[in-house]
Structures are given as C-alpha cells and as structure tokens.
Amino acid sequence: MISVLKICTKDQKGLIYRISDVIFKYHINIVKNDEFVGEGMFFFRALLEGEFDKEAFIGTLEAMLGQEALIELCEKRKKDIVVFATKESHCLGDLLIKHYSNELEANIKAVISNHNSLKDLVEKFEIPYHFISAENLDRKEQENQILKCLEQYKFDYLVLAKYMRILSPDFVRHFEGKIINIHHSFLPAFIGANPYKQAFERGVKIIGATAHFVNNNLDEGPIITQAVSPVNHEFTW
C-alpha cells in the first residue's frame, strides 16, 4: 500500500536525515519525496510503501519534531469529486473524457447543473446528473437544494467547470478548502467575466488557465496550478 506523508514544521538543521531515519526504522520504503524551505518553514511530502503501525509511526515523528509540527499521513487514492456546470460543455466534456479513459486522477461521483442541457452528455458516461434550477429561486434557496443533493455523496472536492454562478459566502464557508474553480485566465490577471475579451483588449501575448481554491474574493483563492499558451495579433476573442 502507498501512503502519503506530509510534514510542515519550523526549519532546522538535519530534518531530512531525522525524518528519513524514522522512516527507515519502521522498515518503510520511500517511493518519492520532495521538500523545500520557505520563510523559515520546512515542508516535506513523501510517498511511502509498506505495512506499518501508523499510530506508532506518527507518534514517533511527533516526539521527534515536537507538538507544533503539522503531520498528516493518509492513503494515496484518487479523490472523489462532484462537478458543478452550467450550459457550456467543453470543460465538463474534457473532464468526462479523461475520467472515462482513466487519465483523470479523480472519480467523478456526480454532476450538478442549474440547466438541463448537459444531461444527455453526462449520462452517456453513466454518471448521475442533477438538474437544480435557479429559476424563481433566490441564491440561498437554490444552494439549500444543492446541499440536500450533496448529502447522498461522499466527496473530497467540488469542482466548478464553467459554473456561471457566484457561490454565497455561507456556501463557500461550508466547504472551505474543498471547492476548486477552473478560470480561463492566467490569474491574477483578468479576474471575473470575459477574461479572453479583457486579454484581447490589453493585447497580451499569452493567455492561460488557472485552477484555484475558491474563497469569498472572486477568482482570488490560493492557486493550485496554471498553464499558458502563446497568442498573437491574428487571434480574436
């Protein structure tokens, strides 16, 4: 079995050696590890292979690093996600195809949309589709229906794939750190609606896409990953 070990603690000399020594003493194999230091803090992430007493292992690390250290150990697995969409199919379609071909490092448990236009597409992939209309409902009423729908699923993240509605502060707080948005610009540039139009009008030479966690500031949550593509004067928006 592969486990993921994550450690965050104050930087000091010899941490890599001391952590590796604990791992060795528990007869665990390190498949991969990464570490870096920033602003006086040490961050460590490793993939561990082997069977071992996890509670005893964590206890040994805590005794060695101190109670202020943040230590997390979990099984490596695909994350379970619920996707929110509206009417546009390209983002959702890409996720569905990658999920179908096993390229997506996640399991799509369901799709929720405020329109019914993508139902046939989603059900072709044998994934549950929930149409929760926003018509004649205020935002709180619609989000309460979404919350009720989500109760039937166990999931790690909610993924917004061109979900063209702004979530309420209460909803975001309810799932703090668990909502991921895909925004079609190289954030922090071109926040909000029509980022391609904004980029075109500014005459930029690269455009991008950003996956980020959602907070209550529009398109300003912590960035997870980004990609860019070059453009020139021949492009339009």
Report the location of each language-model feature.
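Short glycine-/aliphatic-rich beta-strand segments at the starts of folded cytosolic domains
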Residues: 1-10
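FNR-like FAD-binding dehydrogenase module
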Residues: 2, 19, 74-77
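A broad structural signal for short, well-ordered beta-strand segments within beta-sheet-rich domains
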Residues: 2, 30, 106-108
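Short amphipathic alpha-helix segments
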Residues: 10-31
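One-carbon transfer enzymes
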Residues: 36-237
